[in-house]
Amino acid sequence: MLKNDVWIRELAERGGISPFEPSQVRRIDDRPVISYGLSSYGYDIRLSPNDFRVFRHVPGTVVDPKKFNPGNLESATLHHDTSGQYFVLPAHSYGLGVAIERLEVPNNATIVCVGKSTYARCGIIANISPAEAAWQGYLTLEFSNSSSADCRMYANEGVVQLLFFEGDPCSVSYEDRQGKYQGQEAEVTIARV
């Protein structure tokens, strides 16, 4: 069952979302921001200003998810102007960022991550795997810029929405099976096998 704001707030009070914003934030110091925080049936997390990487072409190489070469990624520059802090995701490229919020998923829940419409209308597709039962850490966020124009990715502002689904307790959680992305730190985690 999809969980509501009351359930999400209780999860946060137990340390399940940290830091936690108990309402939708749309402005900071009279400046409009891409919304983040608690909504009726979800929670919008923010993009960290600390780590954003963009794929680059390395002649003679092919990206191999089984033997991922970190050299295929380059750190993006954090820019700042009156609109806020942002990274630039070039046209037709792919970038990896990390969430500001740390998550601890209950044993009987799974979190599905979906893109925000503000970014989707600019050609940005968010592709984040679900956070399964008992997963904990900082989500690595994956973004594809499908448009023919470069796009700003705003740090410290909303970037994806989390939907929380509760079910019957599972027999083996992500933590139990020692999932390879368990305990991710507040930095981009590259592909693992």
Name the predicted role of every residue range.
Residues 1-193:
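Non-catalytic terminal segments and appended small domains
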